[in-house]
Amino acid sequence: MTKRNIKVYLKDKTAIIFSMMTQIIILGLYLLFLKQNYVDSMTSMLDGFNIKTEDNLINALVNSWLVSGVIGTSVVTVAMNSLSVMISDKQNKIDYDYNASSVKGSTVVLSYFSGAVINTIVISAILLTAGIAFSCISGSSFPEFTELLKLYGLVILGSVSAVLILMFVASFFKKNSTYAAFNTLISVAIGFVIGAYIPVSQFSDGVQTFVNLIPGSHIAAMIRNVLVSPCINDISTSLAGADHGMFAVEAEKAFATNLNLFGNEVDFTFMMMYSIGAILLFLVLNLISYKFSSKRKD
């Protein structure tokens, strides 16, 4: 059944295109004006310290931020579109056929979950691999083995988290039309929420706290932390202490490698625990939702 759900999603070219729509928008905005804006911003920051660095290092930093935004949004949008299979089955009454058969309801639900997770991991991992290659070509150093493990591990963590959260939300939808409208809304908003269009640090403290309560923001920030921090360190090393370490401090704030919650900065460890907590919470909520839906069918 998991294989069937994966095939249904992959055969729907429209769903795949919509899965990538946010990433296409991010790339378009980046190429049109975002990249130059942030390159100019970093250059101005260095000019403020009366020092210069190589342009390729600044390009690598900004490109790494782009890649983190693409991956941070992909784990959400791919998960959301993968779960459209579940909504289609409801609308077409295929779930009634499952209920009439010997297949357990829990098996059906698990197949939707596993299919969506596999789709999300595979597509996001492909995008991450392409993103790392792009960053290296632009001048970024190739990630160390431990950093690669972190990045692909975060893709898995983000995929599981996104599917669990969106699966709970999707359980309240019965028609493709309403789910498609919700899908469009989230696809547009997620780029702002995780700081893919504009770094979250540009928002007020209140807005930062609001968007940073969303688990996807923590996944994106951890990916950003792993990808962007080495680039910041490369630039700091090239400055040889001429900035007294201030560039790294300002750049980390500007690109939000850590998040702001209720006026307090939270680090990688907190974000990891928060993400795991969200997974456990929505696992429980999905189990409760499944029990209630099973009782209604009985």
Task: List where the protein language model places each region.
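Transmembrane alpha-helical segments of polytopic membrane transport and secretion proteins
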Residues: 1-11, 291-298
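Perimembrane loop-to-helix junctions flanking transmembrane segments
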Residues: 41-59
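Junction motif at the cytosolic side of a transmembrane helix
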Residues: 238-298
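Short amphipathic alpha-helical coupling elements at transmembrane boundaries
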Residues: 4-8, 92, 96-100, 174, ...
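Hydrophobic alpha-helical transmembrane segments of multi-pass membrane transport/permease proteins
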Residues: 4, 8-44, 62-78, 117-124, ...
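Transmembrane helix segments
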Residues: 29-37, 170-231
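Hydrophobic alpha-helical transmembrane segments of multi-pass membrane transport proteins
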Residues: 25, 59-137
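Alpha-helical transmembrane segments and their short interhelical loops
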Residues: 105, 116-194, 283
